[in-house]
């Protein structure tokens, strides 16, 4: 079962509607399955066979020409563990997976995340490189990341960044 924030779930449902993958007529059925089986609406979409992960990935890749990343093969490094606050990662359903100098590589599942670019750059002070990944891989990666790093707060990131600056001089 996917672990996805309500806000991200709504955004993804809207992307599916906007791309004519599902219709407004499907929503009552999606909500019914979601409620009855205590699953996310995205899981319900998959269960009802209205769409699959590959279709969602294809839409993102075609719309945005993003490179696809297989998060199941990515090792989580220490610099990735503390690059973004846990609550931000959960709320926005983004998976930071690689820090390469001044570049931060982040996997997204749908185009609703494109509006986060400026915010991500402001938080991390890094150039943001977006990649496409399957919804389930992002969900699993976020869970793995947070089980390894614990609850990363904005305050902890600021402190770590301050310490990094001090050690350089």
Task: Report residues per predicted region.
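N-terminal, intrinsically disordered, highly charged
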Residues: 1-169
